[in-house]
């Protein structure tokens, strides 16, 4: 992968205690229960506010928050002026306007619910907040990919993981594709196979 350049990634981890069914993904019920137990909504607002006003004084080039439910996104818009929400229900023209304003810096934070994991082109983006747990390596990698793309105006990509995904999958810099023969590949992190089937 000589064509792939990884930039410095700063990672913060806040683990959650969740349950899953059929090893597919976490249940909505267990996620909501845990969010309410620890006041995840307030915690998320606090983290995003801190990211917007870093001690270094250097502003981020946009903060993209990945949420599981609309409630987290709505809490951000109520608490942080200028925050916008993008979801599957957002009309295409409105979504395009929001993303245009996000890229120009008019909108500092976009909270998105189940969208923008693929097909969103903004290489300058330097901060994502993963405010949803997942058992899906593919989803995790797609989301992380929003912040690790190199750009001349970007010194570092920040992956702020609030749900223990890094603990599950390892740091992005440790992910490796391993050829198992016959064109079958698997994803490994620190010698541990993460994908249950080779692809």
Where are these regions (language model features)?
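SF2 helicase motor core recognition
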Residues: 109-129, 145-149
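Conserved helicase ATPase core of P-loop NTP-dependent helicases/translocases
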Residues: 64, 72-118
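Conserved segment of the helicase C-terminal RecA-like domain
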Residues: 138-142, 146-177
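Conserved interdomain linker/interface between the two RecA-like ATPase lobes of SF2 helicase motors
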Residues: 1-64, 183-188
């Amino acid at each position: 992968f000589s064509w792939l350049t990884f930039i410095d990634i700063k990672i913060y981890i806040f683990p959650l205690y969740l349950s899953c069914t059929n090893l597919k993904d976490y249940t909505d019920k267990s996620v909501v229960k845990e969010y309410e137990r620890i006041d995840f909504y307030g915690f998320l607002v606090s983290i995003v506010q801190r990211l917007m006003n870093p001690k270094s004084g250097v502003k981020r080039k946009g903060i993209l928050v990945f949420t599981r439910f609309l409630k987290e996104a709505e809490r951000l818009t109520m608490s942080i002026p200028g925050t916008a929400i993008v979801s599957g229900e957002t009309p295409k023209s409105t979504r395009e306007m929001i993303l245009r304003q996000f890229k120009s810096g008019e909108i500092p934070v976009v909270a998105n619910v189940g969208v923008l994991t693929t097909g969103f082109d903004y290489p300058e983006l330097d901060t994502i907040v993963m405010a949803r747990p997942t058992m899906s390596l593919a989803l995790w990698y797609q989301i992380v990919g929003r912040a690790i793309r190199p750009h001349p105006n970007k010194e570092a990509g920040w992956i702020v993981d609030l749900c223990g995904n890094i603990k599950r999958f390892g740091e992005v810099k440790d992910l490796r594709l391993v050829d198992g023969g016959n064109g079958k590949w698997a994803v490994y992190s620190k010698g541990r196979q993460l994908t249950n089937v080779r692809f």
